[in-house]
Structure formats: C-alpha cells, structure tokens
Amino acid sequence: MKSNLKGDKQFASKAISYMMNNERTKIKEISYSINNSQVYRKNANTSVVCLHPYSTEIKFMNSGVLPQITKPNSGVLNIATYKFEGNDFLGGFISEESDLCFNSILYNVLSADKFKSEFYNMHCKGVDDNFGNEVIYSPKIEINGVECGVVTSALPYCSMFGGKDANLLFTLRERVDRILFTFALNCHKDIVLGIYDLSLDNIKPSMLAESFSVYLNDKYKNIFETVTFAIPESKTYKKFKEAFNT
C-alpha cells in the first residue's frame, strides 16, 4: 500500500534503482532471508534461559544506527512503521529505517508478499491500531559487510492512550520485552538498538529508556555481551543515559 508521506524525489529515484539492483544481483540472499524470516505474534511466550551468561557492556552512542554495526551476527533493531514496509523507502521518505534499507536487502525482504499479508495489510485495515506486539525477525541481512539479524518493530501511537502514561508505559514494556526476546531467541549476543527522535510519536524518552533499563537489568541481565543504543537526537540520548545512571 502506498503511503501519503511526501518524500524526496531524488532519494526516491536512487531507492528504486538500489532495490531493483538488489533484485538482480542478490536473488539468493533475498530468498533465504524471506524464507527464514518470521513474524513473532503478540501472544507468544517470551521466557528465556541464559545458557552463556555475559557481563553485559551497555553503550550509548550519539549517532545513527549504521556506524555502530560492526560485529558479525549483530542483532539490529529497525524501529519502523507497521503500515508501510521500509517507511515508504521507495517514495523517498528519509528515516533511520530508509538508511538501513539503502545499505542492505532489508526492503527487498520486508516488501515480500508474505509480510504484506501477515503483517502490514492488517494494520492498514486498522485491525490493531496499537500494533500489538508483533515483530518481524529477518536473518542474514548484510549491513556494513557483516551479516545481521534484523528485528522490525514499531512503537505504539501515544495518542491511543489519551494521556494515560501508566497504560503507555505498560505497552512500551511489552514491546521492549518482545524485541529483546527475539534477539535472545535467535542467539544474537551483540545488539544495536537504533532509537530515533521520540518527539515524532509524542513519547517521552524517559519512558522508553526506563522500559529498556528494567528488562536489561532483570529478565535479560547477562543475556547479551554488548548492547549499543544508537541515538542521534541529543535530548533522547541524554534521557537514556540518565535512565541507566551513566
């Protein structure tokens, strides 16, 4: 489905060329990732067992997500829109998600028919305006020359909660649980969490930061070797550091 976002025409032209070139030159890689990608539903069990405990290093970087993807088999968070694959990448809309799409086969994977029917279309039809807790996990997405597992998830619409912070915080925590569980289940010990300017969704940075802090210091403590928050927006970056007392 086409979005109504107004994108940059030059970027759109480059995006279309990049996507088509991937379709010609990376057929096997795209097919593998599509066939092995999975939608994790909101009612799935998220219990975890720590088989190889780590002394987790948590890092905060005031940058976009791409420069922080350096380790093989990294898990990468793609905070996305649930209604338009690639956040209207082909329409020229520039975002953190489009940066990932412009440097990998991610758009070619997310635009597959299986995800349109299982994921995006149901949200366009308003089946769940709050987007539930579904995420898409896509393996073997090469970014910066290393293979990664990408978790595509969206944040809830703040307006759905009518200013009730307690309800929003509960939902944010559920979403964070699903994201971290998916990385743990797929054996990613190094994860890069790209966090954009949360003011776009009227979400208080402190609330999302607290949600990650609660889980990384309890349920997912020692599950990961490194957790890197890539946060280009300065106010959000500051709030995340405060939540972790760094």
What are these regions (language model features)?
Residues 1-246:
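Macrodomain-like recognition of ADP-ribose-binding/processing modules
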